[in-house]
Design a protein with these regions (language model features):
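Iron-sulfur cluster-binding electron-transfer modules in prokaryotic oxidoreductases
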Residues: 1, 83
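Histidine/acidic residue-rich metal-binding segments in metalloenzymes
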Residues: 2-51, 64-76
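Mid-to-C-terminal alpha-helical segments outside catalytic/metal-binding sites
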Residues: 8, 18-19, 37, 57, ...
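Short beta-strand or tight-loop elements
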Residues: 54
Length: 128
């Protein structure tokens, strides 16, 4: 449906982000090698990662590996989440966790991860 609805946005919540680089690489490889089979080229005309970087967001609350691989995960494609009130979350220490995880990142990247990407994904009209 991402091909059919190019403005549709999806978010993978509660899944962290460290797995995304491998899945994107593998999906693109399989698409490249096998797209002529079974009409895949008609259904998915571009590499799968194209749709991810254009329309999909990953969410994380405690993923050092994912943040270490921001270039491949896509700095414009991820959002910090708290996962409150689940037991597998950083609450009530979400603020401290976010500061620990992202304190070394540039301010513009922190803004995107903490607020900017969510604003973009949801089509909101907020200023910094």
């Amino acid at each position: 449906k991402l091909v059919q609805f190019p403005e549709l946005k999806l978010a993978y919540s509660e899944g962290q982000i460290g797995w995304l680089p491998y899945v994107l690489e593998r999906a693109d490889t399989v698409w490249q090698q096998h797209r002529a089979w079974g009409g895949v080229a008609d259904l998915v005309p571009e590499p799968p990662s194209t749709y991810y970087y254009r329309q999909i967001y990953g969410c994380f609350f405690d993923d050092v590996y994912g943040l270490d691989n921001l270039e491949k995960v896509g700095v414009n494609n991820i959002c910090f989440e708290t996962d409150y009130p689940h037991s597998d979350s950083t609450w009530p220490h979400s603020k401290e966790t976010a500061e620990k995880l992202m304190g070394h990142l540039p301010e513009d990247v922190i803004y995107k991860l903490m607020r900017g990407n969510a604003i973009e994904m949801l089509g909101l009209d907020f200023d910094k």
